Design a protein with these regions (language model features):
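Membrane-embedded alpha-helical segments of small multi-pass membrane proteins
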Residues: 7-36
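Ser/Thr-rich, Proline-interspersed low-complexity disordered segments
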Residues: 21-25, 38-63
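Gly/Ser/Thr-rich loops at beta-strand to alpha-helix junctions
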Residues: 79-82, 180-186, 225, 229-233
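Short, solvent-exposed loop/turn and secondary-structure capping segments
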Residues: 85-87, 117-120, 186-191, 236-237, ...
Length: 601
């Protein structure tokens, strides 16, 4: 990135410096998906012939002593323009290791028509028994079955494949890995080629696994993993823990290349007797840093570190998820007694993750443990302090493995959905967003009082926990934002109207209100289009900061806030060495754990 400096003339009619204040509620919502496509690195080859599987039926309670230790079942919903090539390469990574007498690796992959054209450009849905090879340019494993074009966003597709995999490749332990886009409690694993867009909701994944249990007699998967974005949420874990011993997922978005399959599968085939705890440890310890796409000189150590800096991945022991929900319930009961504007403040300052609903609303996916930690800094109430400690202890006990990059400090392994008032309306009142949060997260909410708390927090409804029920708010009740306030920004004063080179001007103003963050923005007036273009948006760095669980937040002091800072005429551009292009960097993190202010394109 190049910093471009040039002489600036700053009369008020040509450029305007604006002070912007972030509070608790904003509007405008759009559902986003995340993923990065690979570069077109590999040449196409022809598909190979179908191989017929040997069917071995297993009945519940039958002797499994002669069976392989593991069958790894990968549901690769790659019928997606963005992620197809990445997910195709993941299967090539699996072939670096391949199946062994003790570890079966079985993949169903549905490709997209019109995106990645490599490896014969096939677009149907194929099932592979992964065999070892060193060819990263094509999938050479035998096609055990071709099932034509199927809709991977339909529950029956998941049911059919996993049932088939268990019946044809029985083992002592099973791992189900679901790979594609993810969206936490909203679900994921879509099919972009379907006649109408489809994806699997969390209730549909749950019901699919229940049918798979009936079909196969497998009571629990040793591990359920989501190689997908944003699935590391209590809403997801709280819905699926009865069906597994361990679960692996990420609180934050994942890079497009996903998990480091070759690395953790190699550890598994070297020690196949490990349980889900051991397998989880391998998946997480190898994440990013051992990915075939990055290793072997394909990326520098600095580039790998940069990739890892914004990632998260965690594993939870399923049997301990109810303890987390129980501790969360006690904590929520305690914080109903405190000023709800302080709860809103804690939500704003908690470690947050990618905003699935767009940049115009506050991020709603935040870390559960960090939220409890932040709240303890805002009150001295003994019950809140004690229940926060209990919740953090329950999370620590349930999370058996976790890693996060330096820019993701405050991540403890389990996130949850805490919307601001606008998003609460959108996901609970707006008929254009079916299904509602209460319906999508029903399995979790039936055990939790989080739904009752949200209704209390935003509508003032009495906090009345109802066991075994997912509570939807009274949709006639008025929603009130507890942290919202009147906001006033005084006149912006600039010490000079002409600067150049490394010179600066002093900008001063006064801000009144319940302020979370202060941004400064530079606008240029374009007389031809009669509109402004944005030159720069920056954080106003407070003189004092508070650090909570590694997360830095500003301490502006009491309102009114006196703003004074030195502004320099800096614009940014991207260059490839030959061409430069101006870019707008938007604020992403106030200050990371290493003291750096983070911006993103």
């Amino acid at each position: 990135m190049a910093r471009t400096r040039s002489k600036f003339i700053v009369p008020g009619i040509l450029a305007v410096v604006v002070i912007c204040c972030a509070i608790v509620c904003t509007g405008g919502i759009l559902l986003y998906f995340f993923g990065d496509a690979l570069l077109a690195l590999f040449s196409p080859t022809s598909p190979i012939a179908v191989e017929t599987p040997v069917v071995v039926q297993e009945t519940p309670g039958s002797d499994s002593s002669g069976l392989p230790e593991w069958t790894i079942i990968v549901y690769s919903a790659a019928d997606d323009e963005v992620l197809e090539e990445n997910m195709w390469f993941d299967v090539n990574e699996m072939e670096v290791v391949g199946s062994t007498p003790q570890v079966n690796i079985v993949v169903q992959m549905d490709r997209y028509q019109g995106a990645f054209s490599g490896d014969g450009d096939w677009t149907d849905t194929r099932r592979f028994l992964i065999r070892k090879d060193n060819n990263l340019e094509s999938i050479t494993s035998p096609i055990v079955q071709s099932v034509g074009e199927v809709d991977t966003g339909q529950p029956q597709t998941l049911i059919d494949f996993v049932t088939w995999a268990v019946q044809n490749y029985p083992a002592k332990k099973y791992a189900l890995v679901m790979s594609d886009h993810g969206g936490g409690w909203t679900g994921g694993f879509s099919d972009m080629s379907a006649s109408s867009y489809s994806e699997l909701s969390i209730p549909e994944i749950v019901s699919s696994i229940e049918v798979i249990r009936q079909n196969t007699g497998v009571d629990k998967f040793e591990l359920i993993g989501f190689d997908a974005c944003l699935m590391g949420q209590i809403e997801v874990f709280g819905s699926l823990y009865p069906y597994s011993n361990y679960m692996v997922a990420s609180e934050e978005v994942e890079p497009g290349y996903g998990w480091s399959y070759a690395a953790w599968l190699e550890q598994l085939v070297q020690n196949p007797t490990v349980n889900g705890d051991g397998l989880s440890q391998s998946i997480i310890s190898t994440y990013v840093i051992n990915d075939v796409l990055l290793t072997g000189g394909r990326a520098s150590a600095e580039e790998i570190a940069q990739e890892e800096s914004t990632t998260t991945l965690s594993a939870v022991e399923s049997a301990k998820v109810p303890d987390v929900i129980g501790a969360m319930n006690l904590f929520l009961g305690a914080i109903t007694e405190m000023d709800q504007s302080l709860v809103a403040q804690a939500r704003t300052y908690t470690r947050s993750y990618f905003s699935l609903f767009g940049e115009e609303v506050s991020p709603s996916f935040i870390d559960l443990g960090n939220f409890a930690e932040v709240l303890t800094t805002l009150t001295d109430e003994t019950e809140i302090q004690q229940t926060a400690i209990q919740l953090q202890a329950a999370i620590s006990s349930a999370v058996v493995a976790e890693k996060h990059g330096p820019n993701m400090s405050g991540s403890n392994g389990i996130a949850f959905h805490f919307p601001d008032s606008d998003l609460y309306y959108y996901t609970e009142y707006n008929s254009d967003f079916p299904p509602y949060y209460a319906e999508s997260s029903a399995r979790f909410l039936e055990q939790s009082v989080w739904d009752e708390f949200l209704a209390y927090h935003y509508t003032g409804e009495a906090f009345a926990p109802q066991d075994g029920v997912a509570v939807a708010p009274s949709r006639t009740a008025e929603i009130v934002a507890p942290g919202a306030s009147e906001m006033n920004v005084g006149p912006v004063q600039i010490s000079d109207t002409q600067i150049s080179g490394d010179e600066t001007v002093t900008v001063t103003s006064t801000v009144e209100g319940n302020v979370a963050y202060i941004h400064t923005a530079l606008y240029f007036w374009d007389p031809e289009s009669e509109s402004y273009w944005i030159g720069d948006v920056s954080y106003y760095i407070a003189d004092n900061m508070i650090t909570i669980d590694g997360v830095n937040v500003p301490d502006y002091g009491a309102s009114p806030i006196q703003v004074e800072y030195e502004w320099s005429p800096t614009l940014y551009s991207l260059t490839d060495g030959e061409h430069d292009s101006y870019i707008l960097l938007e604020p992403a993190e106030f200050q990371s754990s290493d003291g750096e202010t983070v911006y993103q394109v």
